[in-house]
Amino acid sequence: MDTLLEVDRLTKVFSLGGILSRVRIRAVDNVSFYVKPAEIFALAGESGCGKTTTARMILGFEEPTSGAIVHRGGQGGESENKKVWFTEGVQAIFQDPFGTFNPLRIVDRYFFETIGNFGLAANGKEAVKLIEEKLNAVGLSYDEFSGKYPSEFSGGQLQRISIARALLTDPTLLIADEPVSMVDASLRMSIVNLFKKLKEESGLSVLYITHDLATAYYVSDRIAIMFRGNIVEMGPVERVLMDPQHPYTRLLRESIPEADPKKRWGSRITLSNTEHEEYLRAGCKFAGRCPDATETCKSQVPQDVHIDDVLVKCHKYHSVMKDTSSSHCLA
């Protein structure tokens, strides 16, 4: 199988507290997934699930405790041994478009600096032509961009500018960490539609990190659902979100707002102040919230089970698969 990015058993452990009360939290726990060329892969889950920490390790901002990251593609060749550096092949955009740019600098300077750092143009004329090309790709023009400060743009425009800057190096992989969460609702679809356009027209792959299942469903080819450092379900987005197998995925799915003025958003999702406890749980980390939890769930870590093209980390399906295999043996 042709893959662009492979994450293999990635783990990140943080030590919290003082010397006498130090606790080790596995913020990312044995996470594995891959991204194919010309694919949008979503890494989704609620705040604190470990998705951003995973992205930071892929980008080299955090050192993994263990595991491997391999990026294939780009002029840097194959990068491994736990880090993928910012090269021509891998670029990123982040949650806050206003925090990306210094308010006292015109945005042009960021583009010219990137071009200079990577040697992307022989002279100023070539640089301007390259900037125009990338701005046009995200629906902007050089005239409306040149000489302006970040405060002169809307959040949606700044996020498009961030994407255009990332495209300067012709990356094969774009890591987008909550790229629409701080953009007006009316502009969110324009950003996710841009990802789809770039995938279809230039073969760009996107690792789309989000808590928003609605945009994940719309834009992604495959999706992984994270909970307390674990991937609990992964597969084609249509299968995972329209017919969720893991109890946590079902809970997230039910929390998506409906066209009902009497129903408050999130009224079905039960969130408690147990994040710390869930990270330290001996068995399944979701057992404290799960309506199907058994004593086994509370004491033993579930293994990955493959149901057709969907991966599920749940004792319920592990026992079902054992029963099925036993019946086949008897037959």
Residue ranges: model-predicted function:
Residues A44-E46:
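The feature captures the beta-strand-to-loop junction immediately N-terminal to the Walker
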Residues L59:
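Helix-to-loop junction immediately C-terminal to a conserved catalytic motif
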Residues Y149-F153, Q157:
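Conserved ABC ATPase signature
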Residues V183, L187-K262:
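P-loop NTP-binding/switch modules centered on Walker-like glycine-rich loops
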